[in-house]
Amino acid sequence: MYSSHQNRAYGSRRLAKETAGALAQAETRGLISEVMYNEDQPWMTQLVLLPLLQQLGQQSRWQLWLTPQQRLSREWVESAGLPLTKVMQVSQMNPQVTLDSMIRALETGNYSVVIAWLHDDLTDDEHRRLTAAAEKGNAMGFLMRPVQPSLPGDRPRSALRIHSGMVH
C-alpha cells in the first residue's frame, strides 16, 4: 500500500510527464521561459523540467546547457535519463556572452532546448531577441534564475517559479 504522500508524489510526477510530453510534441514556434529556482529544494525543478528534457531528448537535435561555473556530471545526466550523446555544455561564461550565445544557438535550429543561467533581469529588447530566436529555430529556451527578493507584484514575463537547483 502506498501512503497518501507517495500517491500525491506519483500523481505529480505523472502529471509532469504528461505535460512534458504534450509540450515536446506540440507544434510550437518557439518558447522562452524564466525558471526561478531555489537551491534548497532541487527536487522541484527536476520534477517539472526533467520529463520535458527527456521528451526533447528523443528528437534528433541537441540540448545545450550554458552554465556560469558549474559542470554537469556525466553520472547526473545519465541518472536523469537524458541522452548523454545529445547533451552539450559550455561553462565559465560571463552573462553577456551567455545571452548572446543563447540567442545564436536558438536561431540555428540545431537545439531542441537551450538552458542558460542568468542572475539579472532581461531588458525588453533582450527578451524580444530571445523570443525571436526561439521562434526562428523552433526551440525552447529556459532562463534559470535564482530566487531574488522582489517587489510585490513583480514577476517574470513567462515563467515557472520553481524552487530548486539542477546544477551540481
Swiss-Prot record:
Induction data: By DNA damage, as part of the SOS response.
GO process annotations (BP): division septum assembly; DNA repair; negative regulation of cell division; SOS response
Could you say which residues are annotated as the site Essential for degradation by Lon protease?
Answer: H168
The UniProt similarity line reads: Belongs to the SulA family.
Asked whether the keyword Lyase is assigned, the reply is no
UniProt keyword list:
Cell cycle, Cell division, DNA damage, Septation, SOS response
State the oligomer form and interacting partners. Interacts with FtsZ.
Residue ranges annotated as transmembrane are none
Native organism: Cronobacter sakazakii (strain ATCC BAA-894) (Enterobacter sakazakii)
Organism domain of life: Bacteria
What would be the name of the gene that encodes this protein? sulA
State the residue spans of region: Lon protease binding. 161-168
Instruction: List, alphabetically, the HAMAP family matched.
Output: SulA
**Described purpose of this protein according to its UniProt entry:** Component of the SOS system and an inhibitor of cell division. Accumulation of SulA causes rapid cessation of cell division and the appearance of long, non-septate filaments. In the presence of GTP, binds a polymerization-competent form of FtsZ in a 1:1 ratio, thus inhibiting FtsZ polymerization and therefore preventing it from participating in the assembly of the Z ring. This mechanism prevents the premature segregation of damaged DNA to daughter cells during cell division.
Q: Where is this region: FtsZ binding?
A: 105-111
Q: Sorted alphabetically, which InterPro entries does this protein's record hold? A: Cell_div_suppressor_SulA, P-loop_NTPase, SulA_CellDiv_inhibitor, SulA_enterobact
Modification comment: Is rapidly cleaved and degraded by the Lon protease once DNA damage is repaired.
The name this protein carries in UniProt is Cell division inhibitor SulA
